[in-house]
Amino acid sequence: MMIKQSPFLLLTTILFTVAVFVAALDPAPEDPIFELYMHDLLGGSSPTARPITGLLGNIYNGQVPFAKQIGFTPPENGIAIPNANGALPTVNGINGVPLGTGLSGTAYSGQNLNGIQTQLGPDGLSLGFGTITVIDDILTSGPDLGSQPLGKAQGVYVASSADGSTQMMAFTAMLEGGEYNDNLNFYGIYRIGSAMSHLSVTGGTGRFKNACGFAEVRPLIPSGQHEVDGAESLLRIIVHLKY
């Protein structure tokens, strides 16, 4: 005796089989991933970052007696007046980069010398603690400063740890060239001297509206193919997105 199969059951079985087959051929797309290279230039003739508060900001703005943009040299027989915590203002006389905080730690003539001990004031805090630095950094498709420009990173980073080892970063990547032509917002803690830090993607505009995800931030040594007279910090930013 044969059991008559329901046409509805047969159709359901066929549709399920087709759906499984299509899913196997066309898996769900992976989250978009792309790279940015951020060039942060402190000091020199064409800086893209400038401290605006704290001791370092006072030096740049000429608010500390005898401080000059390209060096700190008191007049002959003159006595420098210390700032509020008793520390003397200090500036690299070669390119105007303060001996203090940046994305590469203490900067001397464009060299990354993260091994140098951070200068501390009488209160035990680094001289750059609390310094807010405004950035208009260049974003490129490759690690060289002459690579294809993708846009600008505009925002701030703040020396947020007492020992000068971290920077709180908040900036918008304004992507004006290449495949992407919209804005992404980033926020998080960058650890100076660490092999990798993570920033959160906190949204965006245009194509990246309601975007979320994270970015892996790795410090690199600048290639030096494009000579600059300031101190360059180079960051490789790998962005993982969902939107």
Curated annotation (Swiss-Prot):
Key words of the record: Apoplast, Secreted, Signal
Record's keyword annotation contains Secreted: yes
Key word Transport present: no
Segment forming the signal sequence: 1-24
Protein's GO biological process: phenylpropanoid biosynthetic process
Superkingdom of the source species: Eukaryota
Main localisation: secreted
Family label: Belongs to the plant dirigent protein family.
Summary of subunit composition and partner proteins: Homodimer.
Role summary: Dirigent proteins impart stereoselectivity on the phenoxy radical-coupling reaction, yielding optically active lignans from two molecules of coniferyl alcohol in the biosynthesis of lignans, flavonolignans, and alkaloids and thus plays a central role in plant secondary metabolism.
Name listed for the protein in its UniProt record: Dirigent protein 16
Organism name: Arabidopsis thaliana
